């Protein structure tokens, strides 16, 4: 009997909504979910490590990855490239393990066309004011960049309809529990299990 493939879980939302914080909290709970590391051309923030948080690339290196077809998706966001290396994602799913991608909304749209069977979760802020406060609190962006991110965030919230689920990140621990519940429910879906049990019935005949 063939092994059930893992889930591709795509978590995205506006910049500053807390995608990295939520994924970090999931990781700290030692869940069975694997984590895909994205590539980016943006500069590392304090505490970020190459190969752990991101693969930090030059524009030339990133553009070579695009040309070589090494990315599942990629997008340019506020002057920087972001993308998902494809090999690790495919190998993990084929091994029957779940993997979560923490990516920008623009990238999630591209993944949807390649992996329509993925589980797409939009992480939403409690309010736009709260989102702006979180971005300002980072202390890493200029006022112009903050305004640009807020304009983009409003456009991204309008794209919420392309997602399977919406999780409000009011409190990190609550958001984590909602995502875990979604993953559990997805593994119990009829369309994921029916083939397995039909094969079992055939073996018993």
Curated annotation (Swiss-Prot):
CDD domains: GMPK. Residues 6-184 form the Guanylate kinase-like domain. One of its GO terms (molecular function) is guanylate kinase activity. Its EC number is 2.7.4.8. It catalyses: GMP + ATP = GDP + ADP. Keywords: ATP-binding, Cytoplasm, Kinase, Nucleotide-binding, Transferase. Belongs to the guanylate kinase family. This is Guanylate kinase.
């Amino acid at each position: 009997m063939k092994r059930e493939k893992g889930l591709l879980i795509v978590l995205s939302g506006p910049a500053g909504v807390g995608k990295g914080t939520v994924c970090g909290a999931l990781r700290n709970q030692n869940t069975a979910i694997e984590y895909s590391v994205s590539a980016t051309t943006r500069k590392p923030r304090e505490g970020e490590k190459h190969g752990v948080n991101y693969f930090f690339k030059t524009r030339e290196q990133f553009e070579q990855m695009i040309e070589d077809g090494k990315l599942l998706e990629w997008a340019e966001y506020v002057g920087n490239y972001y993308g998902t290396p494809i090999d690790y994602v495919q190998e993990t799913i084929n091994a029957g393990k779940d993997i979560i991608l923490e990516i920008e909304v623009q990238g999630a749209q591209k993944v949807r066309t390649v992996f329509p069977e993925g589980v797409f979760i939009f992480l939403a802020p409690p309010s736009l004011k709260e989102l702006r406060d979180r971005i300002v609190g980072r202390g890493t962006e200029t006022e112009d960049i903050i305004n640009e991110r807020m304009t983009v965030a409003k456009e991204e919230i309008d794209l919420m309809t392309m997602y399977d689920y919406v999780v409000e990140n009011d409190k990190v621990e609550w958001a984590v529990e909602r995502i875990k519940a979604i993953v559990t429910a997805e593994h119990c879906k009829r369309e994921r299990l029916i083939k397995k049990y039909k094969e079992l019935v055939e073996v018993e005949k």
